[in-house]
Design a protein with these regions (language model features):
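PAS-family sensory modules
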Residues: 1-25, 116-154
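Conserved hydrophobic beta-strand signature of PAS-family and PAS-like sensory domains
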Residues: 30-31
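PAS/PAS-like sensory domain cap-loop motif
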Residues: 38-48
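N-terminal sensory regulatory modules of PAS/LOV and PAS-like folds
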Residues: 45, 52-54, 61
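PAS/Per-ARNT-Sim sensory domains
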Residues: 49, 59-75
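PAS-family sensory domains
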Residues: 84-89, 103
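Short loop/turn elements at sensory-signaling interfaces that couple input to output
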Residues: 98-111, 116-125
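Alpha-helical transmembrane segments and their helix-membrane boundary motifs
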Residues: 140-187
């Protein structure tokens, strides 16, 4: 994976209404870029056109982000994500990117990317995600992996607790029968 250097800790921004637009061929080589993209990147149009789009790749962005992007695009599907890009000077800028394949019939012949300014919250979440991935951790915190499991088992847990309480209150045989009857509507 390309490692563009140098990098600084200076962030550049662009107006919220501005759109950074570029197109590439099927291999990711830039074929078009608008003035806004040229301006924020710090590269000249001549340096950008015919260069691989990863020219603006910032080394803080984990390779897994781009692997996911390319996997999605090669399936003919659009991809969205918050990406930290590197300027020619080493400064950086954040984008909320929407990348879509360009088709000729059934064949992908290139890609178009429209990027807008992300919110501060989107940037904060992306930085946290990038940091987790770059530290070799799972993209999803371990504690969040239990939520779907808990949601699947919640009706059973509630019924079993209800059964126990009813069993204590009535007598174990009646409590079980009543809890079984109550569990039918819960699934």
């Amino acid at each position: 994976m390309r490692n563009n250097q140098p990098v600084t800790q200076r962030e550049r921004t662009f107006p919220a209404q501005q759109r950074l637009i570029s197109t590439t061929d099927a291999k990711g080589v830039i074929t078009y870029c608008n003035d806004a993209f040229v301006e924020i990147s710090g590269f000249t149009r001549e340096e950008l056109v015919r260069a691989p789009h990863n020219l603006v790749r910032h080394p803080d962005v984990p390779p897994a982000v781009f692997a996911h992007m390319w996997s999605t695009l090669k399936q003919g599907l659009p991809w969205m994500g918050i990406v930290k890009n590197r300027c020619k000077t080493g400064d950086h800028y954040w984008v909320n990117a929407y990348v879509t394949p360009v088709f000729d019939g059934n064949q992908v012949i290139g890609y178009e990317s429209v990027r807008i300014k992300p919110t501060a919250e989107q940037i904060r979440r992306a930085e946290a995600l990038y940091q987790r991935i770059n530290q070799g951790k799972s993209a999803v915190p371990q504690r969040d992996k239990w939520l779907p499991v808990l949601q699947d088992w919640l009706p059973f847990i509630l019924v079993s607790q209800l059964s126990f309480l009813i069993g204590v209150w009535f007598d174990s045989h009646w409590g079980f029968a009543l809890a079984a009857a109550l569990s039918v509507p819960l699934g």
